[in-house]
């Protein structure tokens, strides 16, 4: 009689056993795919932020050179904003993706960039496209 119960237990418990094995296999495969997908997402997102920051830096350095040559009273305010933007860009943590205030600093840089564009009467249109990124005026 005990042998008959063991046979039926194996049949009855097969569903639970297969469920557990399937869950474990799915969990392992999902974990490895999640790491790959997360890495790919991080690379793409990081490249977009890097492209945006690089564009702001080039814009600020170009205007610094242009404003330096014509150092008038109006240009001194513009020059202060340019230098403030450059300082924000230099302090940006390029090598630390775990930096807690990354998005706050990025928003501050974007705000300073918009302020500079307003002072310069420039309407920027920053776009990241598959062909590259940049500003359009």
UniProtKB/Swiss-Prot annotation:
> Where on the tree of life does the source sit, at the highest rank?
Eukaryota
**Any idea where this protein resides?**
Nucleus
**Cellular component terms (Gene Ontology):** nucleus
Region of interest (deca-GX3 motif), ranges: 22-58
Keyword set for this entry?
A: Acetylation, Nucleus
Q: Name one Pfam family in it.
A: Yae1_N
Q: Does the keyword Ion transport apply?
A: no
Q: Give a GO biological-process term.
A: protein maturation
Which residue stretches, if any, does this entry annotate as coiled coil? none
State where it is primarily located.
nucleus
The answer to whether keyword Transmembrane applies is no
- What family is this? Belongs to the LTO1 family.
> Which proteins does it associate with, and in what oligomeric form?
Forms a complex with YAE1. Interacts with PYCR1 and PYCR2.
Question: Can you say what this protein is called?
Answer: Protein LTO1 homolog
